[in-house]
């Protein structure tokens, strides 16, 4: 099966790896510029090289996986894809435009899936000549087991079942979800991160204290502020804004501190600074401890 992954950023790279590590799948890793697509593939290769150096992966297996991934433009690589998994920027217009272009490129039997973490599948798929389904991976996509499979208003049962079957084939556990803002995981998880930011903003505790409390008191592997940095504070903000817009419920109001940090370009791990500063030696320091 040939899978077109649209978007060669962190999530797109992880999704490409999730398919390429299973024999029988090939991947077209696409972005809007050739160099961006190639950059995504190069980052995958660099990650694999580290695993080989640590003795966690065999070089022959890396070579097989990398040979299964082709990087380029969707116009050049997606015409014969059997499945498209879109992992573009979390913006309705971007996703609608992307799928509109793919609808003219891909063969009629190609399945269209979006990795959106919060947006309406029905709205993204409006105007397409084929159904759209949600196939929501979790970061890191090659290791996290869950895939939320989201049915929009016009998504046929057979499309949902096809995605559940593919998810199982790549070693994932699919959970079927009806369309709703944030689906299941992000409807619960992102407001928790948002509330942790309010607790910090109100001076209830410092960053390390909040994260330590949740790790030790709730048995969470990562504290909420650390997790927000890992996800990306821009993504957390975008999801909170969608939840608030879709529900009108004030409990989903984004914390002003997160909005301020995003405006300042402090998005977390990917920019080197969020609630923590990420040092070259892979340690991190809470920004309020400096």
Regions found by a protein language model. Name each.
Residues 25, 79, 140-150, 221-222, ...:
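Acidic/polar active-site rim loop that often engages polyanionic ligands
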Residues 1-50, 54:
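NAD(P)+-binding Rossmann beta1-loop-alpha1 motif at the extreme N-terminus of oxidoreductases
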Residues 6, 24, 157, 161, ...:
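NAD(P)-dependent Rossmann-like dehydrogenase/reductase catalytic/cofactor-binding core
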Residues 111-178, 183-187:
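Rossmann-fold dinucleotide-binding core
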């Amino acid at each position: 099966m040939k899978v077109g992954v649209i978007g060669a950023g962190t999530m797109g790279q992880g999704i490409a790896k999730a398919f390429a590590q299973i024999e029988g799948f090939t991947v077209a890793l696409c972005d809007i510029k050739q160099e961006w697509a190639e950059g995504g593939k190069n980052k995958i290769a660099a990650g694999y090289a580290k695993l080989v150096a640590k003795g966690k992966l065999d070089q022959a297996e890396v070579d097989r996986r990398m040979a299964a991934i082709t990087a380029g433009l969707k116009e050049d690589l997606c015409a014969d894809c059997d499945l498209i998994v879109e992992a573009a920027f979390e913006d309705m217009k971007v996703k609608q435009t992307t799928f509109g272009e793919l609808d003219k490129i891909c063969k009629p039997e190609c399945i269209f899936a979006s990795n959106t973490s919060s947006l309406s599948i029905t709205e993204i798929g409006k105007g397409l000549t084929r159904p759209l389904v949600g196939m929501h991976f979790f970061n890191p996509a090659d290791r996290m087991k869950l895939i939320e499979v989201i049915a929009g208003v016009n998504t046929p049962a057979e499309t949902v079942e096809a995605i559940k079957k593919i998810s199982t084939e790549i070693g994932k556990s699919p959970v079927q979800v009806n369309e709703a803002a944030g689906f299941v995981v992000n409807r619960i998880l992102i407001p928790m991160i948002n509330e942790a930011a309010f607790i910090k903003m109100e001076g209830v505790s410092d960053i390390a204290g909040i994260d330590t409390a949740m790790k030790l008191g709730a048995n969470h592997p990562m504290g909420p502020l650390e997790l927000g940095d890992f996800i990306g504070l821009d993504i957390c903000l975008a999801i909170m804004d969608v939840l608030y817009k879709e529900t009108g419920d004030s409990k989903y109001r984004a914390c002003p501190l997160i909005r301020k940090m995003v405006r300042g370009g402090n998005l977390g791990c990917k920019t080197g600074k969020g609630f923590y500063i990420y040092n070259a030696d892979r340690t991190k320091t809470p920004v309020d401890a400096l």
